[in-house]
Amino acid sequence: MSKTGIIYGINGPVIYLKGDCGFKISEMVYVGPEKLVGEVIGLKKGMTTVQVFEETTGLKPGETVVGTDNAISVLLGPGIIHNIFDGIQRPLGEIAKQSGKYISRGVSVDSLDTEKKWDVHITVKEGDIVGPGTIIAETQETVSIVHKSMVPPNISEATVIKAAKDGSYNILEPIVTLELPDGSTKELALAQKWPIRIPRPTHHRFPASTPLVTGQRILDTLFPIAKGGTAAVPGGFGTGKTMTQHQIAKWSDADIIIYIGCGERGNEMTQVLEDFSKLIDPKSGNLMMDRTTLIANTSNMPVAAREASIYTGVTLAEYYRDMGYDVAIMADSTSRWAEALRELSGRLEEMPAEEGFPAYLASKLSAFYERAGMMQNLNGTEGSVSIIGAVSPQGGDFSEPVTQNTKRFVRCFWGLDKSLAYARHFPAIHWLTSYSEYLEDLTPWYRANVSPKFVSDRNQIMAILNQESSLMEIVKLIGSDVLPDDQKLTLEIARVIRLGFLQQNAFHKEDTCVPMKKQFGMMEIILYLYEKARALVNRGMPVSVLKEDNIFERIISIKYDVPNDNLELFKQYKEDIDTFYNKVLEKNG
């Protein structure tokens, strides 16, 4: 018989039940006659506290709350990819069929299509010994992704006593029957459930060794993130957080993208849907949506579901990691998630900490980011979850609690700068405030897969940009004319780096995504120009003479003029620089 409780008090999304209802912490409950989905978040002094994931307007004291004896969970099986869910894994397409354009309260739909038949290849046979994570079946979920159904992590070693034949099955039909060590049997289907707040177990965590290549030069070259890494993208209004995440979602070399729209504008999720349904994945040649799952919990959706959406997304990512895939999560934005925590904390009358955020903000953020990593799974495969979280500090103030606490738990910080964005320099990631702690870990990969000179070139580029920053302090006061020519040259080369390398056009066919070899080639050309120009300056040539030639502007435009698939053209540019060098020498003696 279901456990029940009676509503005693209501405070926005938080409701109180009087007496001992027999509920457990984190248990999923149905609230009121419309069966609104809720979660038990507090048990004390004969009072049960429940947060409701839907609008509570119209609820009244005396109505019934029914327990389910299960934690808030997601259904894991074929059909997740190429789908769009709300914060508690309800498919928005199915909800639209039932309730139209606006989500009705208490709408009940299956998370995944339970009627659809999938072509299944069974990978175990009778008598096989299986353990947690063992792959029991494979299904072609989309053109790009093979879905691997696994023994749940909470089942220890067992024996297969019955295995279905290859064929068509829905996600709930039993395909394998196991005999457990205690003699009981357990039927397994294509789908399984897992609580969203509990990380899926793994065998071993690997140190970072491979970069998540995004095709964005400032990220891949200056501030790389590793597969299984964590990054924060903080920035004020209009600095390009969402656009940066869209670019990473489109072009990163992850196998699967989980895009969580957490408390942001609905039209941004619409843009992702529209773009990804047309874009072709350069790796597979198939549609981007064939490797993407969207979780839409926009700013006008209930605040409690916003808090849950982050955990829903990371649980889906861990499931695909267990199959051996590299998964990247885009969380846009963790600030809205933290605001949801703050609102719920206020409703619960908890003691506020800095700026009204709850005292446990740091532990909640760490619990989220710690679920990233490159792992050896229980079944022996290797997979990764990379988390890239946007942060929206009010007024672009990076000293506020969400940004500061996030910096403690991420190893990559891509700080967006308002002045760069207003100057139309995109991505507006500032090279002086950003950093990556993965560079040392990834150096062996760069040396082996790109060039032994890659990291030294990158360090030289950063040194020039730092010198420019120091010189600009003087230039702002007394102008650049008073500088010696070697410093004028540093400013000119830094301009070439900023405009020709760091600035990137997301709407240009050649520039939207740039392979690592081209990024290295561009660095080499810029530094070769610097080397030759410095040799001329050391011979007494003024920078004004060097600028009479258009070579600096030509090098800035190589990002457009050199196709991504024809890097041989870099040799021509090197010859042009040599010609420029010899011409200046002849002309000026």
Indicate residue ranges for each PLM-predicted region.
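Metallocofactor- and cofactor-centric catalytic cores in central/energy metabolism, strongly enriched
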Residues: 45-48, 70, 156-160, 234, ...
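Short alpha-helix capping/helix-loop boundary micro-motifs
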Residues: 13-18, 49-54, 114-125, 159-164, ...
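N-terminal accessory targeting/assembly segments
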Residues: 1-104
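P-loop NTPase catalytic core
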Residues: 221-222, 228-554
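C-terminal amphipathic alpha-helical interaction region
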Residues: 540-589
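Short, compositionally biased
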Residues: 42-48, 78-89, 145-166, 185-200
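P-loop NTPase nucleotide-binding/switch module
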Residues: 97-153, 170-229, 244-247, 282-301, ...
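Short, surface-exposed secondary-structure boundary micro-motifs
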Residues: 20, 34, 70-71, 89, ...
